[in-house]
Structures are given as C-alpha cells and as structure tokens.
Amino acid sequence: MRITQVTPLKEGFEIEIPNIASDKSISHRSAIFSLLSSSPARIHRYLQGEDTLHTLQIAQQLGLEVTKEGEGMVFTPPPSGIKEPFDVLDCGNAGTAIRLYVGLLAASKGYFVLNGDAYLRRRPMNRVVKPLQSVGAQIFGRDEGNLAPLTILGRPLAAFDYQSPIASAQVKSAMILAALQGEEASFFSEPERSRDHTERMLRGMGARIDEDQEGRLTLFPLLGKRLDPLEMTIPADPSSAFFFAVAAAIIPGARVKLQNVLLNPTRIEAFKVLESMGARLHYSITSETYETIGDIEVSHHTLQGITVSERISWLIDELPALAIAMALAQGKSRVQNAKELRVKESDRISVVVNNLRLLGVEVEEFEDGYEITGGTLQGGVTIDSHGDHRIAMSFALAGLVVPLTINDSACIDVSFPNFLEILSSIAKVIHESQTSR
C-alpha cells in the first residue's frame, strides 16, 4: 500500500499546467466506439490510466487492433465486427467500462463475461442491466444481475422507448450503443440532461441521434453501416483539472492556468460553482473539434458557502474536491440530491463526511448529501482513501493547508497518473511504501 504525506504551503503559487491527464470519459469512448468504425481511427493523448487501459485491453480482446503512430495511437476495427473473446473481459476498477460494454455487447452476437476488481464487484449494475433486460437482453450475474461478474449472451434487441429514472451518462450510453445495433428507431429520455460525450462523438462519426426540445433522444440504428473513424487529440480532463482549480481557490496568493481543457458545458459545472463561491475564473477557447477546448485561469479569492442541488450529474465527480473548498469557505454549504455519490468507487457521502470530521470540520450527513460549516482545518491526521482515487486526490488538497497523510494513494493512478508529480511542483509530497494492507 502506498502512503502519501503532504506538507502545507507557506505562501501562494503561480503555475501553468500543460499536462493535466487526458479526459477519461472521451478516452473510454474513443476505444469502444472504434469497434464500430469502418476504418482506422487516429487518437492522440489517450489517457494512460489504469481504467482506460482496461477499456483498451477489452477492445483488443473484441478485435480492435492497436498500434502506435508517432506520439499517437491507431485503432483499427475488426473487419467482421465484434468478435467473441477467448477470455474474461477484465474492467479493473472502471465503472464506465463495464456499463458501456454491457450495452454494446448485449446487442452483439456472442458470449461475453465482464468482471472487475473487488471494488467494482461491489458496485450496482441494475441501472444498466434492468433496462437492457426489459428489451430482451440476456444478462446474468450475482444478485440477479446487479453485481459483477456479468455474463452476457449477446443478440439483437427490440426497439425501445425508455424513460430513465436517473440522469446518468453511463445508462444513456449503454442504451444508445444497444439501439445502434437494432433494426428500428428507439427513444431515450432522462429527468435532466447528463453528460453528452456519447451523442457528440457518435454524431461526429456519422450516427443519427436526434434530440427534441425536451431532451428526448431518437436513436436510429446503423443497419449494417459502419461509423466514420475518429481523428482527435483528447483534451485535458476537466474533472482532473478541477483539483488544481480548488488548490488555487483555497490558497491566498495562488493562481493557476489549466491548459487545453475540455469545456463541454456538462463538464464544467463545478468550475461555475467555484466561481459562484467567489473564486476568480477566466476561460479562453482554443479549438473546437467534436468538443470545445480551451484554457481556464483560476485565482484565489475569499470563498463563501453555497448550496448545490441542481445539475448534480454535471458535477458528481467533482463534489469531493468541492467539499474541500466548502470546508474552507465562510458560512455553511450544502449538497443535496446527490445520492448517486453512495454508489461510486466508495460511498463518497460517508467517506467525505468522516474524513472532514477527522480534519475538525463540522459536517452533518444526509441520505442524499451533507452540510458543511466552513472555517479552518486541523491537521496531523491520516485520511483513508477507501481505494477511491477522487477521495485521495481531494484530501491531498487539504494537505496544502494542514499536514496530513493519505493511506492507499496508489488508487490515484486509476485516472490521473501524474497528479502527485504536478502537486509536488507546488507542495512537498512524500511517498512511503508498505507491503501489507
């Protein structure tokens, strides 16, 4: 188990960061969608994190050929479509991978087994499995298909008109991937718009996905047609960049410029909340290919408490880092309608609450969120990451203010392998290793 100690800063900092980890959501999708393309895709800056490498390995098992080309990669699709794999498909800790692959493979001819690590095998899959089963998918697993490993007997599925009870990009993406392989148009709606990378990328590849004024999607099947190949440089992940936005916001005299960041409106809601709390932000667009990309400058200013209760699906991954900003803001902050946090890599509501209490913060826990009374932090404590990369990175930010130790920090490598390298450029970070857990 890796242990990380963070020593607090004595003064502010100014830094430009050109090497934020590539966007995880787009990296996952670039590999998966390339299985449906007509010719080789050319991808630059594919995220070399554990989650996305598991996704890429599975794509290779399903027939995708991956070769290096300069600093990029070429994804050549299987000529005869998705092939039945020889072995189990290991998703590691990647919830996005298993849920998107369930949708893709449920409608693909063949026998498939999706599995993952101990953390993933505890995460619920019914939100994807049940709607797919309702249109004929044969998916089996522990707890009546709710828990991995999942066995899929892929076959053509019936057209559907599905109204999701939750706003989830993973559920939406799974249903879209199944619908593309059908014979008639399907329909999908959700209570509020979730992240839309899947629609944007697939439209760019030639798929027809229509959206009405209420956000209801009409999904037209490919009917044997192959998609156009992707050709893209994957931008920096705004969820990863947000850690350093919070770092700048909470440290007096700090300023950070985050370069080449994905600026999709469904992905920068946390930045808008931070700005509403008082931090100074400036955006500049640098390019627009599939997605809007640009730079974000963040500088310190006194933060005020805030209530976050809307568009939760747009900032669900950033809420742990935002909790650190809330703990150092003036007044009370509250997060509501975020029950989804309980089924992430850890129960992020309980873990955030318990770790903030260790730091001396007054916090009240609710079923769907928490209320934080801002003020100061008390250091000299050990934070348990619970194997959750976003918990480990979020509380590393608290280490910029007070000294602390984070247990099981190796989980950071899942999504942001160079996080500690960047953090070390502004703070003293010490690694210690232990052989036993």
Curated annotation (Swiss-Prot):
<dbReference type="GO" id="GO:0009423">
    <property type="term" value="P:chorismate biosynthetic process"/>
</dbReference>
<protein>
    <recommendedName>
        <fullName>3-phosphoshikimate 1-carboxyvinyltransferase</fullName>
        <ecNumber>2.5.1.19</ecNumber>
    </recommendedName>
</protein>
<dbReference type="GO" id="GO:0003866">
    <property type="term" value="F:3-phosphoshikimate 1-carboxyvinyltransferase activity"/>
</dbReference>
<feature type="binding site">
    <location>
        <position position="25"/>
    </location>
    <ligand>
        <name>3-phosphoshikimate</name>
    </ligand>
</feature>
<comment type="pathway">
    <text>Metabolic intermediate biosynthesis; chorismate biosynthesis; chorismate from D-erythrose 4-phosphate and phosphoenolpyruvate: step 6/7.</text>
</comment>
<feature type="binding site">
    <location>
        <position position="29"/>
    </location>
    <ligand>
        <name>3-phosphoshikimate</name>
    </ligand>
</feature>
<feature type="binding site">
    <location>
        <position position="317"/>
    </location>
    <ligand>
        <name>3-phosphoshikimate</name>
    </ligand>
</feature>
<feature type="binding site">
    <location>
        <position position="24"/>
    </location>
    <ligand>
        <name>phosphoenolpyruvate</name>
    </ligand>
</feature>
<dbReference type="GO" id="GO:0009073">
    <property type="term" value="P:aromatic amino acid family biosynthetic process"/>
</dbReference>
<feature type="binding site">
    <location>
        <position position="348"/>
    </location>
    <ligand>
        <name>phosphoenolpyruvate</name>
    </ligand>
</feature>
<dbReference type="InterPro" id="IPR013792">
    <property type="entry name" value="RNA3'P_cycl/enolpyr_Trfase_a/b"/>
</dbReference>
<dbReference type="InterPro" id="IPR036968">
    <property type="entry name" value="Enolpyruvate_Tfrase_sf"/>
</dbReference>
<dbReference type="InterPro" id="IPR006264">
    <property type="entry name" value="EPSP_synthase"/>
</dbReference>
<comment type="subunit">
    <text>Monomer.</text>
</comment>
<feature type="binding site">
    <location>
        <position position="24"/>
    </location>
    <ligand>
        <name>3-phosphoshikimate</name>
    </ligand>
</feature>
<feature type="active site" description="Proton acceptor">
    <location>
        <position position="317"/>
    </location>
</feature>
<comment type="similarity">
    <text>Belongs to the EPSP synthase family.</text>
</comment>
<comment type="function">
    <text>Catalyzes the transfer of the enolpyruvyl moiety of phosphoenolpyruvate (PEP) to the 5-hydroxyl of shikimate-3-phosphate (S3P) to produce enolpyruvyl shikimate-3-phosphate and inorganic phosphate.</text>
</comment>
<keyword id="KW-0808">Transferase</keyword>
<feature type="binding site">
    <location>
        <position position="344"/>
    </location>
    <ligand>
        <name>3-phosphoshikimate</name>
    </ligand>
</feature>
<feature type="binding site">
    <location>
        <position position="123"/>
    </location>
    <ligand>
        <name>phosphoenolpyruvate</name>
    </ligand>
</feature>
<keyword id="KW-0963">Cytoplasm</keyword>
<feature type="binding site">
    <location>
        <position position="170"/>
    </location>
    <ligand>
        <name>phosphoenolpyruvate</name>
    </ligand>
</feature>
<dbReference type="Pfam" id="PF00275">
    <property type="entry name" value="EPSP_synthase"/>
</dbReference>
<keyword id="KW-0028">Amino-acid biosynthesis</keyword>
<feature type="binding site">
    <location>
        <position position="95"/>
    </location>
    <ligand>
        <name>phosphoenolpyruvate</name>
    </ligand>
</feature>
<keyword id="KW-0057">Aromatic amino acid biosynthesis</keyword>
<dbReference type="InterPro" id="IPR023193">
    <property type="entry name" value="EPSP_synthase_CS"/>
</dbReference>
<dbReference type="GO" id="GO:0005737">
    <property type="term" value="C:cytoplasm"/>
</dbReference>
<feature type="binding site">
    <location>
        <position position="390"/>
    </location>
    <ligand>
        <name>phosphoenolpyruvate</name>
    </ligand>
</feature>
<dbReference type="InterPro" id="IPR001986">
    <property type="entry name" value="Enolpyruvate_Tfrase_dom"/>
</dbReference>
<feature type="binding site">
    <location>
        <position position="168"/>
    </location>
    <ligand>
        <name>3-phosphoshikimate</name>
    </ligand>
</feature>
<feature type="binding site">
    <location>
        <position position="170"/>
    </location>
    <ligand>
        <name>3-phosphoshikimate</name>
    </ligand>
</feature>
<dbReference type="GO" id="GO:0008652">
    <property type="term" value="P:amino acid biosynthetic process"/>
</dbReference>
